Amino acid sequence: MAAYFFIAPTIILLSGQSFEQFILTLGLIALVVIFGLTAFIFIRLFMNWLQDKSARNRDFYKRQFKGKTGNSTASIAKSKNVFLEPLFVENKDNLTASIFGEKSDIAEAIEPEIICEDTAAVAHLYKPIALWHGRLILPSNEQRQPYGSVFFEVINAPKKYQSFIGKTAFLQWSTNRHIQFFVHAVSQDINFTKQTKKSQKSGNIHPDRLNGWRNIGPLETLAGTRLEDSVTVMLRRPVIVVNHSSSDRQELIIDREPVQIIGRLCALVSILQRKEPNNDKFIVRHFNKTSQQFDGIAEIIRIPQVQPDKNGIARSTNHLIEQSPLNADGWYIYGERDEDNIFVVQAIEPRRIAQLIPDETHFGLKKSLAYLSSENWQNTPAQKGQVKRVLLTPNDSTENGLISPWQEGDIGIVIHCFGGIGGKGGESAPLGIVTGHFAFGVAKVVRDRFTSEQRFDIEYKQVYAHNPDGIVAGSSKWQSYMGDLQRGWLGDRPVCDIICKLDCVCCDYDFDGIILSPLSELNQQLDMMMARYRTGDGTGASLVTPATSCVQDSSHAIYATIKKITAEVEANPEIQDWLKTNPAAAQTQRFQQLLALGESLEKVLIPLGVVRPDWRKNSRLAGIDSELKKSFFSGIANLIKAAISYRTMLPRRTQDEIAKVLLKQGAFLWIIRTNQVGGFDPNIEPIAPTGF
């Protein structure tokens, strides 16, 4: 009888019939299971919180004791490998020594008379951020065009089309059949629901300008998600240009969703000092490509102090940024010049995080798994202001330990997770639960334009709910999503990006002209998810609840990718014949590894062996409340769906589980951990996301 209670729900879930037709008979069983699981989770989280609290108290008393014995951080600041624990002291005179160690030699070397104030003399040190770069402008309802095109104010263009700069063109989708399939699949009518209007009143930003429109395409939702036309993007190549000379109308035709970026120009600098107290002007020195040092032209720029958000937390601060431990390696600064021809920074990116130089390397599967489980987020508050890069390799051999596994042109999958904001001015965390956020992305190894060294170029695929900050679901470059001074998370949250290098996922397959691309398929699935999140599947609202989140829907994209690739192979006899004919080929071995990876990932995504009904049918997204008929039982059904995929409920748990699967399949993992990097805000501290 007991076995029946567990088997019956499985049979029902696997059937194609409606979930609620059976929920009455299974109500009592479901309640017991859900309440039991919920109780277990909360008890486990409470114990974790209690242990963490005790550990912090012990650390506090240890620091107090060390302080009384005369120890100081100044003596250990000389070692690059020592992480300094910032003390939240009341005496502001000791802040620099407490946080960043002794004063930088760079700041003492500047002489005001060598500062260059000639904009033309430094113009060559700034480079455009993208070849095709512009601002999206939403047309009025009366101006709308077929295929959901939008206006595109051109900020930068290739040399051949420099005449386009400053003009407004039509940006539209290719009429290619596959592209139009994507466009039509995610186009929606938008009509705000009561839940959406309630969310608006609480401060979240929803696509108000699109409310009441019909058949809204993905370009329109990208342009119209915010209340104003402030989304700036780069266009992926190829871009087809149609120049109607007779009507002075320009059209730009694309086949991929634009990528969000910020700023017009980019430079690489080291910050020397603040020009004047209580001023946002800083003296910086540009990178010299010849000497490979920061001994180029000195210039005055502005790094504005942004206003706090509604919770009183500023996303970034310029306070003591010149004393940051990352300053010696430099910052990529993104922005544009103001009316006084002074460069105003809109986003920053520490050069160190993009470099292919690990701070630590762990060899062997056992040590690599142990690092992921216990060391990755260890003692997060003490790492404030720091960056750490770690290479995990499943191979035990250390012979080639100094050789980077990355080469120019390599592509890796990014698994992104961030934590919480603690400290006196931090956000609340009931029972110490910090959910955080999860996303996928793509990292490519490119040649740096300023230094000629190899570096990572990271692009996130943000399945992001509507929020009070105006962060838009979609593809975003690192500098836009993380480095934006006003909206980015670099300065106030701890972040972990795990970049996976596994050829069976990142390389295409060519079966005598039949091309299969797992990475392209994953990108397409995520593009569809992100577009649907912008519309809320027609409700105008994608909201996070305890049982539903971005991590569930990002995981859904992986599941859909696995099933689609598998189905294509099973349905194509030519591919199967190729695999049978070439059993020893390297491509066959890679493909077998891909299948094994898919099976392992399925165990993570659906640990109970039961496919969620919404995943099987690819219907409603977890983070979207469509306000269909609601009932007590539909709420229970949602909780059961979450329980079925319980390993993807929390971002950190999902990141760890997927990373471990990839390691076991032979992948190299490159971990980038940042902890409230940039200037110093004494009222906040980084808090690790909750995991099990």
Predicted regions and their residues:
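Glycine-rich catalytic cores of cysteine/serine-nucleophile enzymes that process amide/ester linkages
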Residues: 82, 105, 117-183, 190-197, ...
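Long, compositionally biased intrinsically disordered regions
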Residues: 23-27, 62, 66-80, 524, ...
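Long, charge-dense tracts
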Residues: 135-394, 409, 429-430
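A short, compositionally biased domain-edge/stem linker segment
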Residues: 392-404
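Generic extreme N-terminal start-of-chain segments
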Residues: 35-106, 271, 285-286, 290-368, ...
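Active-site nucleophile-His-acid catalytic modules used for acyl/amide transfer and hydrolysis
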Residues: 95, 485-604
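Extended, solvent-exposed polar beta/coil surface segments
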Residues: 1-225, 229-230
